[in-house]
Amino acid sequence: MFRTRALALAAVASTALALTACGSDSLSEGDASATPEASTSAPTVDEALVAKLPESIKSAGVIKIGTDATYQPNEFLDADGKTVIGMDVDLFDAVMAKFGVKTEWVPSAFDAIILGVQSGKYDVGVSSFTVNNERMAQATMVSYFKAGTQWVTQKGNPKAINPDDACGKTVAVQKGTVQADVDLPARQKACTDAGKPEINVLVDADQAKVTASVQSGKADAMLV
């Protein structure tokens, strides 16, 4: 399964969208490759894009964005505990600069973002969603990035986690994600059908806490 990050470009004119990311199974050592230096040049406003914006956003000069600010490195809080930073933040700030409006990032529970877009609390949702039929029925999504679902363990995989056979292991996952709602339940069923111990699933709404559970050893692995 793929978790696809979605970004509203032309679709921003609908004021009903949410963004995403997800994927296939893998478990591998991290790669500390060099990161290219980012450009600091300011994007030029595109009047054709500005014309596509709803009047309410154009007049305000600001677009309000709901995000789960616990998902490093895509969207998370800076050291001040207030400012939302990350890869998606930099990207969407640059996109909206082309529309000539500023961004207002509002931290939200992951499973409340789409509801917030539907209710008008947010103009846009930018976070780590999987694009699927259920969500496409609720919000406009435009894919721009694909990444595989990752199994993450402590360094060296000390519990010898095998994604294809995690029966009897403790696995942490964020609430409301496809990993929590689809992936792990399917794996759980495979375990019970085979007469093996169930996966002990730890669910938390805060991705930072999910990560901490692996770091502390409370969980053997996590899915992201």
Predicted regions span which residues?
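Bilobed "Venus flytrap"/periplasmic-binding protein-like clamshell domains
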Residues: 72, 84-97, 129, 148-206, ...
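Extracytoplasmic small-molecule ligand-binding "clamshell" domains
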Residues: 34, 38, 42-52, 56-125
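Acidic, polar ligand-binding/catalytic clefts
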Residues: 102-164
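Short, hydrophobic alpha-helical packing/hinge segments within bilobed ligand-binding/sensory domains
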Residues: 91-92, 113-114, 207-213, 219
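Bacterial signal peptide processing site
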Residues: 23-26
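Bacterial N-terminal signal peptides that target proteins for export
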Residues: 1-10
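Alpha-to-beta junction loops
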Residues: 101-102, 119-127, 170, 215-224
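C-terminal motif of bacterial Sec signal peptides marking the signal peptidase cleavage site
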Residues: 17-21
